[in-house]
Amino acid sequence: MAPLGRISWMGQVDAVLASVSDMLYSWGLMWLLIGAGVFFTVRTRGVQVRHTDAIAASVVGSRDGSHGGITSFQAFAVGLACRVGTGNIVGVALALILGGPGAVLWMWLVAILGTATAFSEATLAQLFKVRRPDGTFRGGPAYYISRGLGLPILGGVFAVVFLIANGLVMPMVQANAITASLQGAGGLSPSLGAVLVVALTAPVLLGGLRAMARVAEYLAPFMALAYLVLVLAILLTHPVQALEALTSIIEGAFGLRQGLGGLAGGVTAALLNGVRRGLFSNEAGLGGAACAAGSATVSHPVQQGFIQAFGVVVDTLFVCTATALAIPVAGADVLQPGASAKESAGTLTQDAIAHLVGEWSRWPMALLVVVLAYTTIIGAFSYAQVCLDYLTDRPWGARTLQIGAVICAGIGSVQQLTTVWTLADVLLGLGAIINLVALVLLSRWVVGALRDWEARRGMSTAKGDQSVFRGDSEYLPAPLPEGAWEYSTGR
């Protein structure tokens, strides 16, 4: 039995971490992310609107040209693996319970702003990436903080924070989601779940970044597409309810069905919960997807900016919306806004699908949660690997992190470590603040790269390499540091 003093001490730590996390995510970070979205939308003159065609077409040909490294599509898939996670099912359900259907509209608006932020951080990751001895690339917030702002120590702080949160704690959190889902659907014991989790994660994590990218390349898009097809089939077979669900989203966002007394409260609840879910689901500005973006091989930095912006669209406007429509279509028997949020959110989507298509769907939905959590482990660990490579290139460092992640996944499968999970939230929040400040300070580089791409757009490859980005482009504030891009002057 643990001493009372120890229990009291741990309780105090939990309380402090929970307070810091709530302050970060409820107000501070939320408004910073919104501000960043507005800032980059204005700074890039609405890149997500002006270049919708380029964003939509960014996936075409993105699987080519890695030269042994990570393709643009693989970097997109790794980012998608983290974006499209269990939060798209549980998190959206929680937003609907707390904010009602109106939360979805605000989620959409935040996603539209977030595409500009995602574009900017991915472009910066490409601009300031470095070439490794094996010919592959590494980039991300730690690198553009160091090489762009000239602050290597701050880059190291970001790397340490993200390494711990994504490389050690995230495997615990997602492994617990896997075993909980299997236990709820079929009564699988946590110990057997731990064996399964370790058996699935060890070969991929120990295989390094390329192995993780190859797995994510197929699993993440396939599971997202399978879920979208399932929900689309439900909507097509329930057209009346689907139309009512869409109507409830508009009315709920502006409180059109509420009396004057409940108007302000209803709109506020919808706005806050929709904004939070939109911000933290698509990860725009948090820094994680930029770690994947900087590892890709592309001919122009903006190409990776477009494809990561497309990831935000897929995550929020497609996958989150699918969940947000499926639940209201199931009816009031399933969705009861304001009721027992924590107890209901975990199973609300599964309950809605089962209500619409039958109880047989619970096992496929459990499998979906398992795969989403599994791909999130892979995606998050790849972020940690990039951060580790910034700190050290020693082989023992990579192997230690890989083994540690597998052990943490095993522990998380059988135990709920609330304090550790809250610590991860705090670390990720602090890392996001560092990243957002760096993004704003480096925004002129984003604008310069975008102007360079716009000037070169439409150039024929028959004219030579005129359409390929150069590190000393006239549109950049200054020539880029050496290490990744070629130069017109032959530096």
Model-derived features: positions:
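Extracellular loop-to-transmembrane helix junctions
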Residues: 21-58, 97-134, 314-322, 362, ...
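Transmembrane helix-loop junctions in multi-pass membrane proteins
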Residues: 13, 44-48, 87-92, 101, ...
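N-terminal alpha-helical transmembrane segments of multi-pass membrane transport
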Residues: 1-86, 96-103, 410, 440-441, ...
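Helix-loop-helix module between adjacent transmembrane segments
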Residues: 36-41, 110-135, 141-204, 367-377
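Membrane-interface loop-to-helix entry segments
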Residues: 32-39, 43-56, 176-182, 189-238, ...
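Flexible loop linkers connecting adjacent transmembrane helices
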Residues: 46-72, 94, 100-104, 116-149, ...
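Alpha-helical membrane segments and immediately flanking helix-loop junctions
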Residues: 66-98, 124-127, 133-142, 146, ...
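Extracellular/periplasmic helix-exit of transmembrane alpha-helices
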Residues: 41, 120-129, 232-248, 260-262, ...
